Amino acid sequence: RTFDQGYDAVTCYRNSKNFAANWISAGYSIWFLREARFLNFPRTLLGTNCHVSGTGFLVSARVIEDNGGWPFHLLTEDIQFSVDCAIQGKRIGYCDKAVVYDEQPTTFRQSWDQRLRWSKGFYQVDREYTLPLLKGCFRRGRLGTSCYDMFVTVAPGMLLTLLMILFNGVILAACLTQPAYLATRIIHETVGFMGSAVWNFYVGLLFYGLITVLSEWRHIDAAPVQKLGYVLTFPIFMFTYIPISIAALVQKVEW
């Protein structure tokens, strides 16, 4: 029924079959549930483009014909496809009743490799599509809104976090050349700022995780204590994206 409304592609509710396995699989699960409920569902209500995630999506034959096949071969081809649709004005919808159950990684090594590929893929999309997306942001109506939404989605926000850490590191290093009383004050202020930033980041992610788990409670196959317990580890899961994002900047990544 959703596809018959004229969409060029339709994405789904992405659930997980192994939420309860450990904090890693739960971290993935919470992220994808949040994506479905609080990103794609509102986008559909507002009439803007959704973005596909993973392999659980449907594509119209006319899209394949218009593109002469499937020309999306970056490391995150799902995001590449979503961005391209926004730029071309093709519509992606969301079907809440179409559910897929992914099996998420359960070891940090598996998770590192997968998210390293995703991070590299996002950088590739940024390189190829930032300018077209920016131009698209100035179009009227749904087209401009969809381009702006995708631009914010793929913007390298983690790099801003890394730059903040680097900047504070430079401040700490520079203060070592200052008199002791001044260096002590600078160190105190800088460390306090960084500690506050980390705490606010943790609390914000904790809130996102809690709201997601509570809203999707009946869809999560896990004991209540596991659902709530893994909310506490969700921010830690997200923190691990920081070293992954750094590695993706310099490391060669392939399928």
Predicted regions, residues:
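Basic/Trp-rich segment in TM-proximal cytosolic loops or flexible interdomain/linker regions
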Residues: 46-47, 106-234, 249-255
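Catalytic cores of eukaryotic secretory-pathway lumenal/extracellular enzymes that build
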Residues: 54, 94, 101-113
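Structural detector for helix-capping/boundary residues
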Residues: 61-62, 79, 98
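Hydrophobic, well-ordered secondary-structure elements that form the walls
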Residues: 239
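Membrane-embedded alpha-helices of multi-pass transport/permease systems
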Residues: 1, 243-250
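Catalytic donor-sugar/metal-binding loop of nucleotide-sugar-dependent glycosyltransferases
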Residues: 47, 73, 82-100
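Long helical/loop segments within the catalytic core of UDP-sugar-dependent glycosyltransferases
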Residues: 2-75, 116, 120-127
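Short, hydrophobic alpha-helical packing/hinge segments within bilobed ligand-binding/sensory domains
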Residues: 81-82, 111
